[in-house]
Amino acid sequence: MASEIHMSEPMCLIENTEAQLVINQEALRILSAITQPVVVVAIVGLYRTGKSYLMNKLAGKRTGFSLGSTVQSHTKGIWMWCVPHPKKAGQTLVLLDTEGLEDVEKGDNQNDCWIFALAVLLSSTFIYNSIGTINQQAMDQLHYVTELTDLIKSKSSPDQSGVDDSANFVGFFPTFVWTLRDFSLELEVNGKPVTSDEYLEHSLTLKKGADKKTKSFNEPRLCIRKFFPKRKCFIFDRPAQRKQLSKLETLREEELCGEFVEQVAEFTSYILSYSSVKTLCGGIIVNGPRLKSLVQTYVGAISNGSLPCMESAVLTLAQIENSAAVQKAITHYEEQMNQKIQMPTETLQELLDLHRPIESEAIEVFLKNSFKDVDQKFQTELGNLLVAKRDAFIKKNMDVSSARCSDLLEDIFGPLEEEVKLGTFSKPGGYYLFLQMRQELEKKYNQAPGKGLQAEAMLKNYFDSKADVVETLLQTDQSLTEAAKEVEEERTKAEAAEAANRELEKKQKEFELMMQQKEKSYQEHVKKLTEKMKDEQKQLLAEQENIIAAKLREQEKFLKEGFENESKKLIREIDTLKQNKSSGKCTIL
């Protein structure tokens, strides 16, 4: 995180006010300044279940997120606390604390669903906090997970394979952590001791049957198992005596239950050690500005009455970042060219030799800062802009050369022009005297350094502009016969034609040079794009293999438990994923 950004306390990120979700612009400004990858940990749960206490522990603070000491819940909307990651240098820990679900004071709990969905969408680790054991009441209270299919879309249009849109959730949903507070029972299943993770998995076991009651029992369990392949569970004893709970944040560790202290330490160690950086499809690492864009896109969709869509969010982010990547690349090109070029160059080749490596650097800058460049729209834009910038430097180089040559011609030939005006050459033999002086001055001009690639063209233009003067001196020189004058005229024409041919040949060579440069530039673009596409494809295949592996594990569990229908559904999803994998398609984009 930028050194000047230090959040000493949490700040509201998304305010839930009058049934409206409103983004806090100051919080967005803070996110904009965080250039590091972000690890986003969000917590949700019923009101007054101690969510904020755990988040303060993750921040390494005694206070911060409001705990409240009465039945009245404190946190409204989603609050954010960005702190340097205590265990991973170069990363920022973004903690998201949410308002209590099903708060009786709110009356209208419509936004509870959106708060839950946003916490899932924005986080890399999603913590669900509840009191007591995982029983049917706890599952019923977690009904929000069953509503995610109605609240979130992975794609903007239906999948042509016919697979349900929610099948893609596993590709971008966070790790699911269930924290059980005031857990007073022994961790046992069928009389045998189990770990907290095993307890969670046992609690997610389905019941056989097709009646309404069984379906209601199975639905939340199915959703958790299908949407969240990475699951973890932590249990916590009651932290202190009931009378002391109202001042929990002020209690010293020795005043707390010893087992609770150990359990909190285990929880914080796991979350801080294993929570991953927030990533998007294709391995796109999320930093502060990218998280800001996701917040704006998702809340904007909700405010407009539509569903937050992962595909739309990624493409919106790509549009913003790819446009910025083009500007970064062009800025790099201009800065480097301005620093390294010494105008005027003596040849076009000299300028192009400078241009090529800097153009290559600019392409690298773009590729490093871009992603999801559908149909190479932005790389094409970059290519066109680089051509325009190159041509602008070529023109400027020629203009500088022309201006320098013009000044030099005026300095060198100015005295000769004055002599012509004074009539110095308007006498017998004056013509040859004029030619002799002009040749000497021409030699002086040609020997002058730093004229650039317009030197010959400017000299030719200058001589052409004085052709009438030369013709007048020739015709008025009484010492020359008519025959001599004709010979001199032919010689002058021949010299002019030779100069014109040289200029034509030069332009032809420059044209060929530009065509060669165009081909080299095109090949450079293709090479770098191919390399990036290979890297992206490799990342995509790795992601899809992980998703397939997760679904296979769950499918095998369903089959082992005797739920053939659920097993077959997952097999269809896996087959579709394998087809997408072979065709190189992202599960989301």
Curated annotation (Swiss-Prot):
GO terms for biological process: activation of innate immune response; adhesion of symbiont to host; cellular response to interferon-beta; cellular response to lipopolysaccharide; cellular response to type II interferon; cytolysis in another organism; defense response to bacterium; defense response to Gram-positive bacterium. Residues 1-309 are annotated as: GTPase domain (Globular). Keywords: Antimicrobial, Cytoplasm, Cytoplasmic vesicle, Golgi apparatus, GTP-binding, Hydrolase, Immunity, Innate immunity, Lipoprotein, Membrane, Methylation, Nucleotide-binding, Prenylation. Induction: By IFNG/IFN-gamma and IFNB1/IFN-beta. Up-regulated upon infection by T.gondii or L.monocytogenes. By IRF1 in response to bacterial infection. It is an enzyme of class 3 (hydrolase). It holds the Pfam family GBP. A lipid is attached at residue 586 (S-geranylgeranyl cysteine). SUPFAM superfamilies: Interferon-induced guanylate-binding protein 1 (GBP1), C-terminal domain, P-loop containing nucleoside triphosphate hydrolases. Belongs to the TRAFAC class dynamin-like GTPase superfamily. GB1/RHD3 GTPase family. GB1 subfamily. Interferon (IFN)-inducible GTPase that plays important roles in innate immunity against a diverse range of bacterial, viral and protozoan pathogens. Hydrolyzes GTP to GMP in 2 consecutive cleavage reactions, but the major reaction product is GDP. Following infection, recruited to the pathogen-containing vacuoles or vacuole-escaped bacteria and acts as a positive regulator of inflammasome assembly by promoting the release of inflammasome ligands from bacteria. Acts by promoting lysis of pathogen-containing vacuoles, releasing pathogens into the cytosol. This is Guanylate-binding protein 2. It comes from Mus musculus.
